[in-house]
Regions:
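Scaffold signal of the M16-like zinc-metallopeptidase fold and its non-catalytic homologs
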Residues: 1-36, 56, 152-153, 207-240
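Buried hydrophobic packing residues in well-ordered domains
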Residues: 26-29, 41-44, 56, 102, ...
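Short beta-strand/turn micro-motifs at beta-sheet edges
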Residues: 27-31, 87-90, 145-151
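An aromatic/glycine/proline-enriched structural segment found at the starts
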Residues: 35, 40-108, 263-291
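C-terminal regions of mature proteins
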Residues: 40-46, 188, 192, 197-291
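Solvent-exposed, non-transmembrane alpha-helical starts
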Residues: 54, 110-114, 170-173, 272
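Active/ligand-binding-proximal structured segments within catalytic/core domains
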Residues: 102, 111-125, 131-134
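M16/insulysin-pitrilysin zinc metalloprotease superfamily fold
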Residues: 126-128, 147, 151-208, 275-279, ...
Length: 291
């Protein structure tokens, strides 16, 4: 990825870019990238469509639609995730905790295996009932929590497992992450799948009873061009999913060998231990924020 990718820049900017921002830049952005033509609106409430449209008449009159450039398509669609190293250690001198992040690029929300991936992640790290929390927190006491998730949209899609651990057990914690992730496919069982199915179905049926929840569903349909019945499609996928299918998803989308590791911590005391795990090429990165 590196500094050549748009993904290497914070979305809210840096001190340098913010300092250089001018009023003309803001006006130019408004002129070239903001328009009702790229806006999407979702509504839940006691008004019918005719009443909602009427309430927007003044906005339609005073803010004329025009074609503008979609920056998401221009930058994110072409962004590549090709790290040069397997493990990046970001030095934070004197840190009493180490932050561990392990991940890989993944599928978009519209991919066939998008929801199955969410299903298999449930027992891995979706909550405090997952293996990561159970082993790193409850069994070893290395952290207050350890979790994993798939972030799915149209462009910047990835899997990530993470935790903040005591600095003195950085090596041990990273070894546990490796063992859990690399062994998850063999460990995953019919019992895991049945428990996940029961948990998700129980919560899903009652999760769209409020206007706010319904609005969230409409926003998903709007933002990602999903089918109107995408939630019911997910229910059917979950009910029909087999253990073999789950294991196939794990092998494809949770392959530890494809993942990149980032550790933020005190390099003086922890880097040697991390290197001793022989997880691949290690690159030491100096943290400018600590200077």
């Amino acid at each position: 990825m590196g500094t050549s990718s748009i993904l290497s820049f914070a979305a809210d900017g840096t001190e340098k870019t913010l300092s250089a921002l001018t009023l003309d830049d803001v006006k130019s952005y408004y002129e070239n990238h903001l328009s009702p033509s790229v806006a999407k609106m979702s509504f839940v409430g006691g008004l019918d469509q005719k009443e909602v449209v009427a309430s927007l008449a003044s906005l339609e009159k005073n803010w004329k639609a025009k074609e503008v450039k979609n920056l998401s398509t221009e930058y994110l669609a072409s962004a590549e995730w090709k790290p040069e190293s397997k493990l990046y250690f970001i030095d934070y001198p004197g840190a009493r905790q180490s932050y561990i992040l392990i991940g890989k690029s993944s599928m978009s929300i519209k991919a066939a295996d998008a929801y199955p991936a969410v299903v298999v992640n449930d027992k891995l790290g979706a909550s405090s009932q997952g293996l990561l929390f159970d082993i790193l927190r409850l069994k070893h006491g290395y952290t207050y929590g350890a979790y994993s998730n798939f972030t799915q949209g149209l462009y910047n899609n990835y899997f990530a497992a993470r935790s903040s651990v005591q600095a003195t057990v950085t090596k041990e914690s990273l070894a546990l992450f490796r063992d859990i992730l690399s062994g998850y496919g063999n460990l995953y069982s019919q019992e895991f799948l049945d428990q996940t199915r029961e948990t998700i179905l129980r919560t899903m049926y009652g999760s769209f009873e409020t206007p706010k929840a319904l609005l969230g569903m409409l926003r998903m349909i709007n933002a990602y061009d999903l089918a109107d019945d995408y939630q019911m499609q997910r229910v059917q996928t979950l009910k029909a999913m087999t253990l073999d299918q789950a294991k196939e998803v794990i092998a494809k989308d949770l392959n530890f060998d494809d993942m990149v590791i980032v550790v933020v911590g005190d390099a003086k005391s922890q880097l040697a231990g991390v290197k001793s795990l022989n997880l691949g090429k290690v690159e030491l990165v100096q943290n400018d924020a600590t200077k």
